[in-house]
Amino acid sequence: MKWLPATAVFAAVLPALTAFGDPASVEISTSHTGSGDPTSDAALTGFTQSSTETDGTTYTIVGDITFSTFTNIPVPVVTPDANDSSSNSSKGGSSSSGATSLIRSSNLHSDFDFTKDSVLDLYHLFFPSASNTLNPALLSSSSSGGSSSSSSSSSSGSASAVVAADPKGGAAFYSNEANGTLTFTTDSGNPGSLTLQNLKMTGDGAAIYSKGPLVFTGLKNLTFTGNESQKSGGAAYTEGALTTQAIVEAVTFTGNTSAGQGGAIYVKEATLFNALDSLKFEKNTSGQAGGGIYTESTLTISNITKSIEFISNKASVPAPAPEPTSPAPSSLINSTTIDTSTLQTRAASATPAVAPVAAVTPTPISTQETAGNGGAIYAKQGISISTFKDLTFKSNSASVDATLTVDSSTIGESGGAIFAADSIQIQQCTGTTLFSGNTANKSGGGIYAVGQVTLEDIANLKMTNNTCKGEGGAIYTKKALTINNGAILTTFSGNTSTDNGGAIFAVGGITLSDLVEVRFSKNKTGNYSAPITKAASNTAPVVSSSTTAASPAVPAAAAAPVTNAAKGGALYSTEGLTVSGITSILSFENNECQNQGGGAYVTKTFQCSDSHRLQFTSNKAADEGGGLYCGDDVTLTNLTGKTLFQENSSEKHGGGLSLASGKSLTMTSLESFCLNANTAKENGGGANVPENIVLTFTYTPTPNEPAPVQQPVYGEALVTGNTATKSGGGIYTKNAAFSNLSSVTFDQNTSSENGGALLTQKAADKTDCSFTYITNVNITNNTATGNGGGIAGGKAHFDRIDNLTVQSNQAKKGGGVYLEDALILEKVITGSVSQNTATESGGGIYAKDIQLQALPGSFTITDNKVETSLTTSTNLYGGGIYSSGAVTLTNISGTFGITGNSVINTATSQDADIQGGGIYATTSLSINQCNTPILFSNNSAATKKTSTTKQIAGGAIFSAAVTIENNSQPIIFLNNSAKSEATTAATAGNKDSCGGAIAANSVTLTNNPEITFKGNYAETGGAIGCIDLTNGSPPRKVSIADNGSVLFQDNSALNRGGAIYGETIDISRTGATFIGNSSKHDGSAICCSTALTLAPNSQLIFENNKVTETTATTKASINNLGAAIYGNNETSDITISLSAENGSIFFKNNLCTATNKYCSIAGNVKFTAIEASAGKAISFYDAVNVSTKETNAQELKLNEKATSTGTILFSGELHENKSYIPQKVTFAHGNLILGKNAELSVVSFTQSPGTTITMGPGSVLSNHSKEAGGIAINNVIIDFSEIVPTKDNATVAPPTLKLVSRTNADSKDKIDITGTVTLLDPNGNLYQNSYLGEDRDITLFNIDNSASGAVTATNVTLQGNLGAKKGYLGTWNLDPNSSGSKIILKWTFDKYLRWPYIPRDNHFYINSIWGAQNSLVTVKQGILGNMLNNARFEDPAFNNFWASAIGSFLRKEVSRNSDSFTYHGRGYTAAVDAKPRQEFILGAAFSQVFGHAESEYHLDNYKHKGSGHSTQASLYAGNIFYFPAIRSRPILFQGVATYGYMQHDTTTYYPSIEEKNMANWDSIAWLFDLRFSVDLKEPQPHSTARLTFYTEAEYTRIRQEKFTELDYDPRSFSACSYGNLAIPTGFSVDGALAWREIILYNKVSAAYLPVILRNNPKATYEVLSTKEKGNVVNVLPTRNAARAEVSSQIYLGSYWTLYGTYTIDASMNTLVQMANGGIRFVF
């Protein structure tokens, strides 16, 4: 503001001018300058402007007026320096020798009035050398007013201070009228300036003294500089109000000094600076309070156009001067009436130079008015600074000399820049408000307020480098602090305090609201030069000493040590902290404290809401809460940006933040919550939250907004790189709950105890760690020296997580997760627990009970490990999962895999149990109701030792009980292993590893569709191994029941049980396959020690299993036989029950590779049942070679049940099969087959009536050497096909019945043949053997009677294939004279009869080409008619998808060259095309046609039916072009190329001979079609009709592959091919009809269809039986035909079209009909 209108000036000063009548008016147009010498200045009569008007005086300043260089301070008396006798005097002006001692008093004001004489008397009493005469202008009839201070001046050296007898101020202007207002104004048209400088007075107000109000208005400049008062008000003093307003340019107070209050001004009532251009207080000094301004009332500064500056002002209480020994009191002084403080002060100043001086103990300071408060401003009431541009408080200080004691009852505690005994309000700043470099002796380095502090509407607030020796380096308030509505920046930087609150201390609450950018940086609290005595972490919050009751001062020497209370490096609140509406950032950075709360300390609740970027970074605390400490709950709501705690550190708990015991952190709707790189020397590297930490998002729709279909998620949590020396590297809490978030990440956190990322605490029946409804949860790269590399807690629940990753964490137990109680994982769409490491148990997860349920997506537990190099016997469990209770996998619907996990001891010397490479479950593991494949792959339990006395077990799973049941998708165990470095089976005292995939006390696999064990390895039980974990109860049992199929493939064992090892094994109602398994010793598929039951409900196959060693050494050397199943019991037989009641059982190619022996079952075995029901079989293609521990042979009934009418097969057709079953066998039901070269040895064999025994060539049925026993058979089927010699091979091997040699003959050794012998011709060609062209003796049985037993063949009846309708005919009879070594059949030849001749036609095989060609043309017609022909090329360039149904019918009537032939087909076409340009179309189609053909009877003896199914792929295109000379008529080109693959099958029936032929063959076909058309008549505006001429070339080529008939007298046909080129030429007419929004587009065409090129397909055939050959020629259609076509399209709006075409081709004897219909969609 340069100039103000006159009306504005008048309005501003009107209240002061009209308060008490009309004041006197004085114009001042002359400057005044004194000499600076008190004697000379006393003689000046016109210098001081005195007002005696009761209504005051108005001074009009004309021009630039200056009052300068005036003093009434006596020249001090200089005495010789005691240390320098040569010094006689001291020269120079007046100066202070030290601050006056202040007396403890509540009232320093005196009502005693001096008369002139009394003043002179008192003056001469203390100054005997002074003149007897004083200038009246320097004397007052009364004391100088209400100053509560006394002062002195002094000189340097040994000069004594001199004080005037009557202190007086007002060197320039003086008014003693209480109601008289001194007003300073000017001419508004030519404003003047007033400068008061270098005025030094003994009384109050060196330049101006007024008992009434004081008003400055309308001046150009107002300047007070270099003025000094030995009392209060270094420049001006008023006991009324001070009003300074409408100053055009500047108001300046610089270098003013007072020994009392108000270094520049002292105001008893309200102080107002208003409507100024600028206001400046600089280098003003007060000896008591208010270095710049002191007011007993309020201070208001408002409407400052430019700047407000308070720079280098001081309120400094000096050390007292030594108190001299007083002389005897003068009779002139009445001690009862003179102000005590005045006398003491003056006496101290006026002591004669020769008087001795005695040191005095400093007097305590007892009032806030004298305690050095307010380095720039002191106000006993409120302060308001508002509506300004810039405000600066810089380098102001409030101090008390260190030798002085501030009474503990004193309210005042400094305020380096501002002190207010009430509230402070600074508001409406458009520029910058700066508090910088201010210092306070105690609290409030910048601001000290007894009341509330409000900083509002400040564009830039900067509080930097303020310091105090108490609390609140920048701000101290005994009530609340509010900072709100900041437009740009609020910053607290570099502030320090020694106690609490490096920047801010508030006894009340702190509110930060509606600010843009708030930063607290590099603030510090604490005494860093003294040792730290930390308070205990659980002590009550420190409260300011000023809030406690007053107590007597305690001498410093006697004071007890004080616990360091330096809390809150930047901020301290004894109530709460409330933050809201921060739009850019609230940052606490690089702050530090020596106790709790390196960034902030909040005693009660901390609430932050609706803000952006709350951040605590790089703060330090010597106790808890490196970033934040809160004594109550913390609530964060609706925060955007990163809510960040980063690189903070604490010496105790909570590197980032810490809360008091029992308190919680609740966060709702945060965009990002980050704990990063914080450290704590105890718990909670990132955060220590003793009760609950909750982070969630709550979505509330607006009133008009519909509820969301799916609850939205929002926000993230990032806990990364934090470190705790104890537990909870990221977070330490009792309960943690995260929900409704987009992501939660715990990464690279470290703890030296438990919970590398997160530690929660177990609570009874309560989940203490939960993650619910979150998109991504990542727990990665965390480390704990103790347990829980990622998470440690009691009970955890992960629910409705889209993506869960637990990866690369490390710990002693629970590398990823460690829980003392349960873990529940459910509804996790995608999950991964991978690459985690533990040194004892639970590489991925460690918990008591674990439930993985309702997982709809992909979930993997992969590459986790428990790995260590053991030096002590510490058991290692659970590479992927460890459970001290039960593990349950249920209702999993996505893909699930436990892969690549391991538990391993890398040491080679120390033994330990190593179990559960994938999962270790102490009590049970259950996998049930899963409808996704479950994969266990490449898991391992291993030791580097070559032998071990401990148990290595369970490469994938280890548990007492494993149950896998009621799943609907495959369960797969692939390449898992339990192993040591052993190369041979364990010796006595050592243990084999067990269970490459599963090791358990009991295993139950039931009601699953498919289970696969492939490539697993262990030393026993390559896939499944049973271990006694319960001392035999329940028994070690494997139960596999009610499954669809179970596959054991390529599993291996070093010892036995390549697939399964157990005591009791039951495979029932399950299809199972054991293929390619191996072991070193017998039992390559199954090794069983008690009982084995095999009762499948579909096929049970043992195939290609291998034993690799020749012998196995236990107590004795045992030869390996290559047994797939081995009974491993050295004391008794194991029992085996084979039941094929619902599915067949096969043993095939099970081999001992070292000896090339094949064996299905071996060991000490007793068969309790071998049962096969009707249609089922038990097939032994490998030998059964069992032994027994029983003394007497046991009974065995084959097919004992009446329903067991199936087949039991022993076959030697693949390799030698000598089966030994040392039991007494009764064959009760069904069919027993001894296949080619198979041998069965039993103790005895008895065939029950109604059964059949089929014996193949070379088969042997023998008794056994264990006991004597006979063979009794009564219904035998003999495969005769290979026991009748041929002309080329006379050597044959009939079946053999054998009695083994015995030392002592026994009558039980006998052979008895009765009943029926059925001769079987399985290939139907026995009677084509020319060997039967004469009488022959054919051996029916060879008899090997080494036991010399009885052999009888009585009542034997022959049946079966005893003759044929064709071939060699004769009769068979049993030779009654057969010798003891053979049973002979005699053949008597009768005649030879040929096949009956049936004439057969062949052309219908070739006629199928017609059906193939017709399917190609039908598809082509659909493409042309539906898309290429009807979709006009002037249409817009849209894309189309279309689909149509196809139908065709071909009928060939009988003619002289062929029989009738019909073909009908149906199918579909699906196509998509595009128009890159309007005139060009390109598309592709896929078609399938399912056709059937039929020929009628011929010669009444055969009928032919067939089918031809085609699959076709087509490309089609169309384009418009013009002939070069004719541009008026476009030519439309259309082309189709189709490839087809056809499959044909036929059946020809010959009823007369009850025979048939069947044939199957393939054809490959191509079609190429090119059409050109031109419009002869185009549509007109009045007609949509169009006439078009078109011609096309249609070429088809079909190649039929060769094939051979089956069944009756088969023929072999060669391949052939057919090509056909037709040139359809014709006309078409089309037009459109419209009805409402529907357009109907119709078209009719007719064409002549000549065939101009074709070939006649020919094939050759050969009759296989007679080698007769011939040719087959196709009957060709006629060359000329006609084609008619009708099509229609219905346009249903812009996108959908219905269409259809019907085409008919007619020629002589042939009619072909083709139809297409479908729908088209434009996109």
From Swiss-Prot:
Residues 85-100, 140-161 have a biased composition (Low complexity). It comes from the Bacteria. Residues 1434-1723 form the Autotransporter domain. It is found in: Secreted, Cell wall; Cell outer membrane. Residues 1-21 form the signal peptide. Keywords: Cell outer membrane, Cell wall, Membrane, Secreted, Signal, Transmembrane, Transmembrane beta strand. Gene3D superfamilies: Autotransporter beta-domain (2.40.128.130). Residues 78-100, 139-161 are annotated as: Disordered. SUPFAM superfamilies: Autotransporter, Pectin lyase-like. One of its GO terms (cellular component) is extracellular region. One of its GO terms (biological process) is double-strand break repair via homologous recombination. The keyword Acetylation does not apply. The keyword Secreted applies. It is a peripheral membrane protein. It holds the Pfam family ChlamPMP_M. GO terms for molecular function: ubiquitin binding. Belongs to the PMP outer membrane protein family. This is Probable outer membrane protein pmp20. It comes from Chlamydia pneumoniae.
